[in-house]
Every structure is written in C-alpha cells, then in structure tokens.
C-alpha cells in the first residue's frame, strides 16, 4: 500500500484560474483565491485506507477525513457542499467523485497520485483540469 503520509509543499500548479472560472467563480474572488493558493501547505496522515488531509493557505484551512470506499461530506474547490466517494483508481492513485448536495454545477472530482516523493493532485470540473504537483518536505 502506498504511503501518502507526510507534509507536502507545492512545486507547480497549472490551470487553477481556469478551474475556478469553470466553477463560475467571479474575477475578483479568483484573483484572491489564486494568490492565496499559490503556496499551500498540505499535511496527510494515513492509517491503511483511512486518510486525514489538512490543506492550509493564507486565506483558509480545510480538513477532510475519509476511508477509501466510504462516502463522506466535503466542499468543492469553490466551497459548495458535496458528497464525495474516494476509490483506488490504481495502486498509487485515489480518485474521488463529488456530487453536489444541492443546486447544479459542473461534475467535479479530484485525484491524488503518489510517484516516489512527488504527489500529483488533480482537480476537475467537467472538461477543465487543474494539476498541482507537490514534493515531500
């Protein structure tokens, strides 16, 4: 089983603004979000298939707890409440499908894939994909 545990620092980010645009976030909020999320700190704790992920930026901190294969409550990147279902897509990759609790919006998901000491986080909203690469601290 892959070990996602540790603290992670972002090395690169592609298409974050485009993702926020696809989610319908207005220009002013996008500018704030892009600036705030330019240097996130991520802490992951793992016990088998149970995960705790804390992501801290200058504007907000999010925490999620989940067990692979069990639905949990989460918020989309733009803060809407959703039900999320994480599954193993491959030996080193978790895919989490998100379903909005209310209202309409793009189909969203995230994946986290471990490649040695690099963690690739992908956010998706319909056909728009944001890729962020992290390295262990």
Curated annotation (Swiss-Prot):
<feature type="short sequence motif" description="Nuclear localization signal">
    <location>
        <begin position="21"/>
        <end position="31"/>
    </location>
</feature>
<keyword id="KW-0845">Vitamin A</keyword>
<dbReference type="GO" id="GO:0016918">
    <property type="term" value="F:retinal binding"/>
</dbReference>
<dbReference type="InterPro" id="IPR000463">
    <property type="entry name" value="Fatty_acid-bd"/>
</dbReference>
<keyword id="KW-0813">Transport</keyword>
<protein>
    <recommendedName>
        <fullName>Cellular retinoic acid-binding protein 1</fullName>
    </recommendedName>
</protein>
<dbReference type="GO" id="GO:0019841">
    <property type="term" value="F:retinol binding"/>
</dbReference>
<comment type="similarity">
    <text>Belongs to the calycin superfamily. Fatty-acid binding protein (FABP) family.</text>
</comment>
<dbReference type="Pfam" id="PF00061">
    <property type="entry name" value="Lipocalin"/>
</dbReference>
<feature type="binding site">
    <location>
        <begin position="132"/>
        <end position="134"/>
    </location>
    <ligand>
        <name>all-trans-retinoate</name>
    </ligand>
</feature>
<keyword id="KW-0683">Retinol-binding</keyword>
<dbReference type="InterPro" id="IPR000566">
    <property type="entry name" value="Lipocln_cytosolic_FA-bd_dom"/>
</dbReference>
<dbReference type="GO" id="GO:0005737">
    <property type="term" value="C:cytoplasm"/>
</dbReference>
<comment type="function">
    <text>Cytosolic CRABPs may regulate the access of retinoic acid to the nuclear retinoic acid receptors.</text>
</comment>
<dbReference type="InterPro" id="IPR031259">
    <property type="entry name" value="ILBP"/>
</dbReference>
<keyword id="KW-0963">Cytoplasm</keyword>
<dbReference type="InterPro" id="IPR012674">
    <property type="entry name" value="Calycin"/>
</dbReference>
């Amino acid at each position: 089983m892959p070990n996602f545990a540790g603290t992670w620092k972002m090395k690169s980010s592609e298409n974050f603004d485009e993702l926020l645009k696809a989610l319908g976030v207005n220009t002013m909020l996008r500018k704030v979000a892009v600036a705030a999320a330019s240097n996130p700190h991520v802490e992951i704790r793992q016990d088998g298939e149970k995960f705790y992920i804390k992501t801290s930026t200058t504007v907000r901190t999010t925490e999620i707890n989940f067990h692979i294969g069990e639905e949990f409550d989460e918020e989309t990147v733009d803060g809407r409440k959703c039900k999320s279902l994480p599954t193993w897509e491959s030996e080193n990759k978790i895919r989490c499908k998100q379903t909005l609790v209310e209202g309409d919006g793009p189909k969203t998901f995230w994946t986290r894939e471990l490649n040695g000491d690099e963690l690739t986080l992908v956010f998706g909203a319909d056909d728009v994909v944001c890729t962020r690469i992290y390295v262990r601290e």
